[in-house]
Structures are given as structure tokens and as C-alpha cells.
């Protein structure tokens, strides 16, 4: 079977099957973990002007070993059952890797959101939510959607309002969906979460001197060059945070209209501002060389230390894998590297940080938002002022004991209590760092495990298996 004929779901299962022998689990249990438990296909009408349009939509719940299930909703003309099943499976493994207590799920609506005005999109979204309610496929203890490609906080607010309308007695209704606006029980830091998680994951990978030496790089992320393909939410935040907090030099950026390249570095904030002012195009940007749409895929082949594909799946395949010149590939998108390309890149000693770990920042902060909704209180409200007062007292004692005054600037920095955004970022950093260390430990301790992706699957499979074995089989 050629690479082009292998479905996305089959590709995910191929990776699963490659990792399964390293778990020593019985075949029946592995089959249960791998299977999609529930697949819902919906066709519902929406009135648009004087006409009716039938909308094709899906919701897949891959695994019920933990509840609720969790996964985003994407709006795209390319949505199909196989894709949604694959993404739901990846969500199960992703949640297990980062110790988020959800089963995996995913939703999709087969439309191009850019073809509709806001009023029509609201109709489509609210009716989709109603279809989920009718099938008992949404709720804070059942299945919790989130944003994905083509959706955002606006759509999540519509979903929340629709669910709340039909579940008036559910005091935890806000927990039915995450990625909501902050004004509608959202959490600070959710918008940047996936991109920030990508940065934390890549930074942790670069912190191991032995691994960096193997690919001819020095320890640490600072000073490394990066190319980012895709300037959506994930790609833009990854680039901005990597530049601002990691000291990374962005040398190439690609999008649907083409790409820009400057080996001396590109100011990502300046580039994003230019593209916004230039009707969504890089063309004419003075800080780099622009290459048009027909050359856009060449951005993946630019020389760099770190390549971040942050758009769609299968962009790195057997046709271009030999031309990839990066030392590290950070899979910010879902499934950007095909299994055939992975084998080629492995032979070339290129490190691939797998998607099921690297883009888990979104579901991690969604978990924080869900917890906030169930507790009905923002993070930091109870302890912020207490911690500030304790810190001020400690500074006063320090000044008295040393006879030296702390500057007002230092006092403000040291004494400040953690706000919600600080706690969210800290929790995300801890999650990504500890998860990478678990994956690397499995990889390092088992020389027969070929790569980080296989190690990540081993970690995920073992954690899910432990849940199934602890729960038993009913009846």
C-alpha cells in the first residue's frame, strides 16, 4: 500500500502497532485501547436565506477509560469520518501522556467557515450543539468540546449558551466546553496555550546536551534558528514566544500565500503586523525575501536548527523528507510527518518531537479551564494577597537583618502574588516538562525503541491500560 492511500486513522494505528510490542500487554486489551468507542455522524438542515443547506458533521468519542471525553471541533471542507477518528485517537493518547484525566474525542463540521457570515455560522454552531445534546454527547461530565481549526472562542461561547439554555438546572454548565472567552467563564492563557506548550516542549528537548550533540547542536534553545510553517494561532504564538522568551532566531515563515526567508532573522511581531495590514499576505515585506504561493512548500526545506510545521497533516512525506535540512522537527500540527517520512528522517538522525506530546498545551489549559468552571472561582483568588503579604514580610525581615534596602522595583517583582495567568503558565510548563522527561526516560532506557514517537505511544498505552485494568470489565 502506498503512502498516499493510507488513511490518517490507519497511520495513527500503525504507530500504535509499532509501539505495542514494547508494552507486554495482551492483544485483547490493546485492541480495546485502539478502537473508537463511539462514532456519530450527523446530517442536519440549516436555513440560509430562502434556501436550506444540509450540514454534514461528526463527533467521535475514542476512549471512555476516563470521563469526560475531550477534544476540539474543527470547521473545514476536508472534514471526514476517518480524520475525526484519527484526531480523537490522538486526543486519548495525548491526554494520557500529559496526565490530563480525559478520554479522547473530536468533532468536525464539513464547511468552510470563511464562506459564511457570523449569523449563519452561529446557526450552524447552535444546531450542531443541539444535535450533540440530543445524543447525550456534550456535558461537563460527558464530553467537553474545545476550539480547533476554523473555530475559536466565539463558537465556544455559542456552544456554551446553547447547552446552558437546554440544561438550566446544571450548575456546572460552563464546564460543557472550553476555550470560551474570558468573560464567559474562560481562563486566561487559553488562546496562547498550544503555542506556548510547543515552546516549552522544544525548549526541554534542547536542554539535553547528549541529544543535541547527536544532531550537531549545542545545549539550550537560545540562539537556535527556527522555521515555522503556518501562522495560525499555534504557529504565531510558537514563533512569538520562542523569539521573545527563548532567544530563538526566526529565519523563515510560511503560509498559504507563500513564505518569507531571511537567514539573518525576522522580527516575528513586525512580520505579523505587516501581514495583518497587507490583507493577509507576506508579499512585499521589506525584512525578508518573499516567495510566492507556488513555492510555499519549499519553506519546509530551508536550512535551520528547528522546523515547526504548524498547519495541516502530511506536509512532510516521502517526496520531500530527503530535502529537509532541519536538525529538529517539532510537530505543532497534528500528523505533519507521514510514517514513510519518519523512517527516512530517522535514518538521517533528525529528532522528531511527536505531535501527541508537543501540541498538548491546548488540552492541558482546557483542563485548567474545566477545573475553574467546576470550582466556580478563578485561579489565584484565594491565595494571591496572602502570598503577597508573606513575601513583603520576608523582604522587611531581610532588610532589617542585612541593613540593606531592596529597591522598589525588586520589591514589586518579588512580592507580587501569582495571578491566574501566572498559575496557568506555571502549570502548563510543569506539565510539558514532566511529560517530555517521561517520554525521554522510556526512550533512553530501552535501546530497542527507535524514536521519541514510539516512546510516547508506549507511555500513553501503558497509562490507558492501567486504567482499563483497574476498572475491570462490566458485567
Question: What do the predicted segments below correspond to?
Answer:
Residues 2-41:
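Short, Gly/Pro- and small/polar-rich lid/capping loops
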Residues 76, 96-222:
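Glycine/serine-rich phosphate-binding loop and adjoining beta1-alpha1 elements at the start
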Residues 181, 185, 189-301:
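Glycine-rich phosphate/diphosphate-binding loop of Rossmann-like nucleotide-binding domains
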Residues 258-352:
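Rossmann-like adenosine-cofactor binding region
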